[in-house]
Amino acid sequence: MTAEQCQRCNKNAVEVISRKELFCAECFRVFVMQKQRKQMMSDDYYRDIFKVMYKDKIRSAEEAEQQNKNSTILIPLSFGSSSLMMLDIVHLTLLEQKMQHQKTGFNVDVLICYRESNDELLTNIQSNIKELSTVRYSENKDNIRFHTLCLDSMFEIDKELIDQVVLHNVEFTGRQVSINESEHANLSLQTVLTSCPNRSTKEDIIDFVTKHLVKKYAYQNGQKAILWGHSMTRLADEIISCVVKGRGAQISSKLNTTNLDVNYGSRFKNLYPLKDILLTEVDAYCALFDLSKYLIKYELQDSLLVNKLKKEKHIGNQRLAKNMTINELARKYFNDIEGEYSNVIATVLRTGDKLDEPLATLGEKHCRICKSTVHDDVSKWLRDITVNVGQPLESQLERDLHEKWATSHIGLETTAYYQLRDRVWEQGDDVDLCYGCIVTMQGVKNLNVPWPKNNEQELNEVLAEYSLE
């Protein structure tokens, strides 16, 4: 039986079936490269970054050469399939520029953020960086530079730049107070995560920390744009997750690739080059072009491949729905429908792109935690729909039960929170919190979290890169 031929070149055997079209490996590579490059050339700002500049009516030859040298982008690399594929296509773009122009129009800084966890993970990261820089991308070793950053560096700054942010359990308002020496000495990402009982809250905190450090790195190092490796599928699950978490008002700003990031000095833009590419297509690319060996804590899907990677799925390893975070539930939903109903994913993303940011009735106020605009007085709204004030003890039985509760672990924690709350409300300053972060902080023990200040001094606090050797 003769193997089917690619519908594009009509020469090579089919290796991928996507969007009802048959592709050979090379035609599929061109297909996804064109979609990524379309986003990379989506407006004049990005074209000025990625194109090789020459002398013209606007710039001299020297100015054009300087612009080519100064055009630097930042790629956060998680060693998942999407960021790896995006970096691979950027590498191929640089090679093409060298062949056609004998020079390149931009340079790439790759940032790997990691948590202090286990030696095996750090060894894998170190091994991947070495092989990518010296083997796979050796032809662009002068244009692609790798950097590592520990997430703990979020809190490894001067004590004066970190405050204790506390949520009032009845008023749903926030205040902050400076942390003391002992609290600062013991502060790390792990201590913050330890105070988060549920996985969704931990995931939110890690996401806040990672994005802040990536953007802070771009702010300090003069990058023109951050290229986030989010596929169409990932962006769709981000949109749904934002709605579920009460962050729907932030969707427009999250997807904004047109404006400079005002929360970080308006020095760079955020771009999603893979927004027209499905996650299954990303995974197929990684499988076909030998990127799977660089994956860390990620398993490729092979639903689009003619030659499957595996014959059976291990159902026993799948996480139960009740143990999933909100993001994982949304991701599972889109993974399940991507094969038959990929148009649903595209519809979700198109709808998200059409959303405008709500009118800010409170003026220019930003959330103390996530930096998003606070549009309405959500604290007042929450007070109007909830009752959190306790009733006085009336009977002896109620007093006895309250005494037992007060000496329990939960009772002691609650008493400690009341003491902290009263001190902060007496000594601290008011802060603004968005609805999503009020929900997140309610998932933290004692409703408080140590957090860096939102000011220029904190942004200019130099980040220390880490060596994994």
From Swiss-Prot:
Database matches in Pfam families: CTU2
Signal sequence range: none
GO molecular function: nucleotidyltransferase activity; sulfurtransferase activity; tRNA binding
Keywords associated with the record: Cytoplasm, tRNA processing
Keyword Acyltransferase: no
Keyword Phosphoprotein: no
Pathway: tRNA modification; 5-methoxycarbonylmethyl-2-thiouridine-tRNA biosynthesis
Superkingdom of origin: Eukaryota
InterPro entries per record: CTU2, Rossmann-like_a/b/a_fold
Cell location: Cytoplasm
Alphabetized SUPFAM superfamilies for the sequence: Adenine nucleotide alpha hydrolases-like
GO terms, biological process: invasive growth in response to glucose limitation; protein urmylation; pseudohyphal growth; tRNA thio-modification; tRNA wobble position uridine thiolation; tRNA wobble uridine modification
One Gene Ontology CC term in the entry: cytosol
Family statement: Belongs to the CTU2/NCS2 family.
Function recorded in the entry: Plays a central role in 2-thiolation of mcm(5)S(2)U at tRNA wobble positions of tRNA(Lys), tRNA(Glu) and tRNA(Gln). May act by forming a heterodimer with NCS6 that ligates sulfur from thiocarboxylated URM1 onto the uridine of tRNAs at wobble position. Prior mcm(5) tRNA modification by the elongator complex is required for 2-thiolation. May also be involved in protein urmylation.
Protein name per the record: Cytoplasmic tRNA 2-thiolation protein 2
Species: Candida glabrata (strain ATCC 2001 / BCRC 20586 / JCM 3761 / NBRC 0622 / NRRL Y-65 / CBS 138) (Yeast)
Gene: NCS2
